[in-house]
Amino acid sequence: MPPLAPASCPDGDDAVALATLLERVSLARFQANDSVRRQPRLSDASPRPVTRWLSSASPAAFTAYAGLAAFATYFSMYAYRKPFTVASFPGELDIPGLPHLGYKSLFIIAQGVGYAASKFLGIKFVSELSPGRRAATILGLIGAAELALLLFAILPPPYSAISMTLNGLPLGMIWGLVFGFLEGRRVSDLLGVGLSISFIVSSGVVKTVGRWLLSTGVPEVWMPVTVGALFALPLVLFVAMLAQLPPPSAEDEASRTKRAPMSAAERNAFFRANAPGLVALVVLYVLLTAFRDLRDNFARELWDALGFAGEPAILTTAELPVAFGALIGVGAIYLIKDNRRALMAIHGIMLFGSFLIGGSTILFDLGAIGPVPWMISVGLGLYLGYVPFNSVLFDRLIAALGSVATAGFLIYVADAFGYLGSMTVLVTKSVGSPNLSWLEFFRVFAYVTAVVTGVLYVGSALYFRGRTREG
């Protein structure tokens, strides 16, 4: 295009010519910009080979691939969260006017504060995050948690408790990000249960790895970050596998309703519309989370008190029948196609779990069963109630209600208050009853959990029976 000669005051013909020229230049720029806008973005490119294969794979093949990727990803995450609980961390925090608080309890509380805060942040963050950013976000958050463990090894106690809060803060969002890859599919029940089994098995395994490192001479403060380093490469591999999953198909959306990010207004409207039932579920989940954290974080103290101080393998072997039982019990929900009936069946399974917790504790107190059957029974009863919250319960609830929502939102509402309640229970015991053994406190809390959750399960089932639709 030739350059425009400057002109002072163009006459009529020159003005028309200039206007025509400017119009053509403007049109050319618009067409160029439009061409750029029409260029395919990275997200619009053709699906990757693995994604294309998964889109047409059989349900069994898809479930095996997705289940392995999700299970192993969350399994690896536990290497950055739980190994420190197997250490003893001698010493106490002495604050004038307050009971002494052991360093181990301090570190558990500090991590729990970060984890609980993460759940509240996740209500917004996880429910609004676009699917294409999930994989990179998972790696970034777990990387930040590993850096916090490095800081834990460097800082002296009690200041190292700050690093445990920083460790829990990113890890609390991982579950919702991983589950986001799985929800809204016809096989979500199986995938969700498989994912949930990971936190039953992985906790014992990473603790066993931690105890092994301690036995080789690794200092207690360096053991957690060392375990994390061992799991770094597997984590990257399995997150990469997870990122290949295609979005739910049209058939998936027809069966389980469409899943979409929720705005703040949509989240508030959904919660208000179902508040009585959701409040009941959240309250009982607080008890389940507190009971689970007692059993998990102080597993070493519980097994030592029961006479298994010299058998570190019990931390893993006792969890295998629990995981298998929970997998069979909750996984059977997949066989029920009607979402309303499945929701009621889930409540029935969770109610049975409450009976198992209370009944096995009575038998243990009477001397009718030994410590191993009791710990396995209360563990199975606990996870029959706990696993559905993190897998099938909210996915089926959304489908039965016919609402466009995300299960991650509901999971994080429950988790946020669950971990807040868990920290409250832990602080109450550590400060209010420091001389009460962890075993005795756990036994009493088992009765409380069994009774209260049993009543709330019934109330929730009756409420949602009237709110949901068949199909």
Features from the language model and the residues they span:
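Intracellular loop-helix junctions on the cytosolic face of multi-pass helical membrane proteins
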Residues: 21-22, 27-30, 36-61, 214-284, ...
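Pair of pore-lining "gating" transmembrane helices in MFS-fold secondary transporters
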Residues: 57-82, 274-291
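Central cavity-lining transmembrane alpha-helices of secondary-active solute carriers
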Residues: 105-125, 324-329
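C-terminal ends and interior cores of transmembrane alpha-helices
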Residues: 142-156, 353-366
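Hydrophobic core of transmembrane alpha-helices in multi-pass small-molecule transporters
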Residues: 159-174, 370-385
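Intracellular juxtamembrane helix-capping segments at the cytosolic ends
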Residues: 173-185, 385-401
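Glycine-rich segments within core transmembrane alpha-helices of 12-TM secondary carriers
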Residues: 189-211, 413-425
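Transmembrane alpha-helices of Major Facilitator/SLC transporters
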Residues: 313-337
